[in-house]
């Protein structure tokens, strides 16, 4: 499992680092103004929040602690925890709203916005370590766990379903399934 964790998180971080300079730009704009240089060692919130999730699981003996997750996300926002330069940047509006709610004492289960205007990829980008946790858990209850982790910042059902499907595919890869059918997910 250690190889899957390392490979998964490194793959995510490399993809994040390579994609970050082009984030928010159209293909058309990149034709005229391509990314020609990249700063070394820079990653975005995608990697930082994934590392927060992984650190929480590892430091809690692979147990999920939703309060600890939100504390680490808030520490990232406020203090640049697990960032390459000690400063959080590139934070999505929905994630920021949920974390500010948490910092202002809103109960954990009420921090994230639930409307369709808050459907971003903020929970999807950090959910992979949860699949590593789920590998040692019974299949029943997978969706509820994934939903709970997603809903810390992104509570709309579209976000939680996206996370569930992503984890299902990652789980199939971890289980060495060469071909899998959507029906088995």
Give the ranges of each region predicted by the language model.
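Structured, active/binding-site neighborhoods that engage oxygen-rich ligands
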Residues: 1-185
């Amino acid at each position: 499992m250690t190889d899957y964790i390392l490979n998964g998180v490194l793959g995510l971080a490399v993809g994040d680092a390579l994609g970050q300079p082009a984030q928010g730009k159209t293909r058309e704009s990149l034709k005229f103004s391509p990314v020609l240089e990249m700063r070394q060692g820079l990653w975005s919130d995608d990697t930082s929040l994934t590392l927060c999730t992984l650190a929480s699981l590892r430091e809690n003996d692979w147990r999920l602690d939703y309060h600890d997750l939100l504390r680490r996300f808030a520490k990232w926002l406020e203090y640049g925890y697990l960032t390459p330069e000690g400063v959080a940047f590139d934070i999505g509006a929905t994630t920021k709203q949920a974390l500010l709610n948490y910092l202002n004492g809103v109960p954990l289960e009420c921090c994230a916005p639930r409307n369709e205007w808050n459907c971003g990829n903020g929970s999807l980008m950090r959910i992979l370590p949860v699949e590593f946790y789920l590998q040692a858990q019974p299949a029943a209850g997978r969706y509820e766990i994934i939903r709970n982790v997603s809903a810390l910042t992104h509570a709309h059902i579209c976000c939680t379903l996206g996370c569930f499907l992503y984890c299902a595919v990652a789980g199939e890869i971890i289980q060495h399934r060469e071909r899998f059918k959507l029906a088995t997910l």
